[in-house]
Amino acid sequence: MSHVKGSPESILATQQSLTHLFDRVDATHVQLDPTRTSLTGTGGLVEIGKDGGQNWNYDMGFKWSSPELELNDIGFLKRADQKFQFFNLKYRTAKPISVFRNINLDFSQFNAFDFEGNHNRTQYQLRTRLRFLNNSRISSWLTHKPRIYDNTTLR
């Protein structure tokens, strides 16, 4: 959670910054208010999964940063007004197989929304990493992005 206070001019500058863009013409869930003297927002991550143990690992979760979240000097915030759903599935070999010291296969998927409910992004990725017995390696990945709508590039 964040709560920032300041003069109307400084809060207006925060509302208009690239992180927030309260003045977007397409956004109906936020309003640019030049008289405001504070912003209060939330952000977080809820994640469950399994790491370690056998060959299969996974994680899934949800993270968010509300439109008024402002980390200011205590952290890094590229963009507010986002909700992410994600899922990752990983297969790892722990023992050499044939000419490979280890094999890593990863599948990941995520969706991004804003707090107005707009579905802004979908992405799928498949990655492979093969390490040979002599420690040389080959990596490849395939990414599919059937939906990309970036509301910060509208300016």
Placement of each model-derived feature along the sequence:
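Exposed, low-structure sequence patches enriched in small/polar residues
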Residues: 3-155
